[in-house]
Amino acid sequence: MVSSKKPKEKKARSDVVVNKASGRSKRSSGSRTKKTSNKVNIVKKKPEIYEISESSSSDSVEEAIRGDEAKKSNGVVSKRGNGKSVGIPTKTSKNREEDDGGAEDAKIKFPMNRIRRIMRSDNSAPQIMQDAVFLVNKATEMFIERFSEEAYDSSVKDKKKFIHYKHLSSVVSNDQRYEFLADSVPEKLKAEAALEEWERGMTDAG
């Protein structure tokens, strides 16, 4: 005999709780979702502040600033015993050449090779010792210094601030020591005076 009674439907346990006040449903068993904040934490870089005591001198402040500049430069940074860094600039090849040239110029003022080349222009002296070239170099230097000083004295007498050609020629014409330069540094003459001198020379020769 078949029973006409319908099986009782099992009521599903509702895990939904109705909030009467708001009318919204919330799951009691479900975990509440936490809203993550989209705020980005911005870290502000604080400016560097140097604390200087009243007893510190200005020299220590300058050394600290130099130490910071040395770190930014391309030089080598070395640390002292007190922890301060000091920049040591590296020497380039150009600076080394200038230093070597300065050491050589302290002894002589004219290139030795050029003096040797001038001395070798005469075939009578094919071999020249280094000390002879050095002495000729120093003698040339002393001669030019003495000649320039006397030309300067001549410009002072002429009330001029610069040395002109006439001052050099006056030194050559007035001093017998420079007579060998008479053909190289002759006095400037006007055309009329030069013509009279030439005619006088021709009459004396005739």
Curated annotation (Swiss-Prot):
Record's compositionally biased regions (Basic residues): 1-11, 23-37
Assembly information from the UniProt record: Interacts with DREB2A in the nucleus during heat-stress. Component of a heat stress-inducible transcriptional complex with NF-YA and NF-YB subunits made, at least, of NFYA2, NFYB3 and DPB3-1 in cooperation with DREB2A. Binds directly with NFYB1, NFYB2, NFYB3, NFYB6, NFYB7, and DPB4. Binds to GAPC in response to heat-stress; this interaction promotes DNA-binding ability to its target promoter.
Ranges in a coiled coil: none
Gene3D superfamilies cross-referenced by the UniProt entry: Histone, subunit A (1.10.20.10)
Gene Ontology CC terms: nucleus
Compositional bias (Low complexity): 50-59
Record family assignment: Belongs to the NFYC/HAP5 subunit family.
Basic and acidic residues bias (residue ranges): 63-72
Induction entry: Enhanced by heat stress but repressed by dehydration stress in young seedlings but not in older plants.
Lineage per the UniProt record: Eukaryota, Viridiplantae, Streptophyta, Embryophyta, Tracheophyta
CDD domains in the cross-refs: HFD_CHRAC1-like
Name the record gives this protein: DNA polymerase II subunit B3-1
GO biological process: positive regulation of DNA-templated transcription; regulation of DNA-templated transcription; response to heat; response to water deprivation
Record-annotated disulphide pairs: none
Expressed in which tissues: Expressed in seedlings, petioles, cotyledons, hypocotyls and root tips.
Keywords (A to Z) from UniProt: Nucleus
